[in-house]
Amino acid sequence: MKILFASSESYPFIKTGGLGDVSYALPKALRKIGIDARVIIPKYSDIPEYFRYNTHHIASFGVPVGWRSQYGGLEYYEYDGVPFYFIDNDYYFKRSGLYGYYDDGERFAYFSRGVLQAITYMQDFNPDIIQCNDWQTAIIPVLLKDHYRNYRNYNHIKTIFTIHNLKYQGVFGKSVLGELLCLNEGYYNENALKFYDGISFMKGGILFSDKLSTVSRTYAEEIKDPYYGEHLDGLLRSRSYDLWGIVNGIDYDILNPETDKDLFFNFDSSTLYNKTKNKIELQKMLNLPVSENIPMIGIVSRLVSQKGLDLISCVLEDLLQDGIQLVVLGTGDAKYENMFKYFAWKYPNKLSANIQFNNSLAQKIYGASDMFLMPSKFEPCGIGQLIALRYGSLPIVRETGGLKDTVRPFNPITGEGNGFSFTNYNAHDMLHVIRNAEYFYYNEKYNWNKLVQTAMNDDNSWSKSAEIYRNLYMSVL
């Protein structure tokens, strides 16, 4: 079985979020179970020089973009046993950053067409399935069925479209149809690409792919509801039978507290005293009062309302009256950045506000904190809570999307669970659950440590999800 994983980003070359992690870790896990999975991404100029200068050039070819033919280069690099292809074009990809340009519609129309053109030149690899990811590659199923269906190398290829975040849909003007995609006016209707007064790449992926998937079971149900459906819920309900919810995992080779070089001390579930040493060292590093007994709550997040920052803002001063330390890492909306800066000034012994993104510090926070706060308004899957579980930082989450699927609320009667959760999007519900966790930490330390061990021993690797993806692939062949 041969899978081509088309994505706009991938670790270790370039990433802005969870899609970049998935684009590497899932193909890696698939290859471990005998599936020939390969990845194709744009060759951005922001990719580190070591990688850019060591790719192997395979072919040069033309890529139709409307009436024009643009240069396309196909390059190859193998990393950690995973084959990667790159589409090279300086005009579209020799820029700072990945997204947010006025011509993003043209850039990713070009990339999508380039992926299909490149298949002819992949020598020993002809995919059975192209797995497309988010709006940047969502138009591939449309182009495949319209422009390539009669070609021998293409007429057997199936497509799966994976929705990582329905909120970002790739909506552009009607002129994109003919000028960039070479598609006729027949596609400009409610049963095709038309979306209000424009066209939606995301809608094309949902309508024209053979199967759909998204990144958790709960999110697959949520996006069929108008509250989460971003005006595509009706379309998703109509394809409900074809929609699979498969929770993401994390790469246990990389995210491993036993070997993580960013930690002060390595540890596992049987050496939790070393986790406590990490807390003490982080307290010293961040100029917080040093105490192994005070519970530390970590937040590693974009500082935006979607991540529940509006809830935190409502009760932050109340929370800082408790016997806790709060360590925050992230950037985002100025109002939330300034909020944390102000309260860090007002409560320097309680709050450390690190308004930056620093991966090494993030790992230290996961390794040192006792609890990890993630009260998202919506969360398709979420990776933070999975890393927190792996590192023994008990998640406190709102029950939405992948948070609901991966964090089992602690039951004080049975002792079951691996974290804490609340249902309603309500600041005082959140505060109540945080204080329940604080009480448990202070008054039942033995049982707290047992809960930490349960969390660390959970399997949130990609191995289970890779098997479910195998079943999804088999269902379309």
From Swiss-Prot:
Keyword flag Transferase: yes
Pfam families: Glyco_transf_5, Glycos_transf_1
Any GO MF annotation of the entry: alpha-1,4-glucan glucosyltransferase (ADP-glucose donor) activity
Binding of ADP-alpha-D-glucose, residues: K15
GO terms classed as biological process: glycogen biosynthetic process
Domain of life, per lineage: Bacteria
Pathway(s) of this molecule: Glycan biosynthesis; glycogen biosynthesis
Annotated EC: 2.4.1.21
Catalytic activity as recorded in UniProt: [(1->4)-alpha-D-glucosyl](n) + ADP-alpha-D-glucose = [(1->4)-alpha-D-glucosyl](n+1) + ADP + H(+)
Disulfide bonding pattern of the chain: none
Keyword Ribonucleoprotein recorded: no
UniProt KW keywords: Glycogen biosynthesis, Glycosyltransferase, Transferase
Main function: Synthesizes alpha-1,4-glucan chains using ADP-glucose.
HAMAP family registered for this protein in UniProt: Glycogen_synth (MF_00484)
Family: Belongs to the glycosyltransferase 1 family. Bacterial/plant glycogen synthase subfamily.
Protein name: Glycogen synthase
Provenance organism: Clostridium acetobutylicum (strain ATCC 824 / DSM 792 / JCM 1419 / IAM 19013 / LMG 5710 / NBRC 13948 / NRRL B-527 / VKM B-1787 / 2291 / W)
Gene that this polypeptide is encoded by: glgA
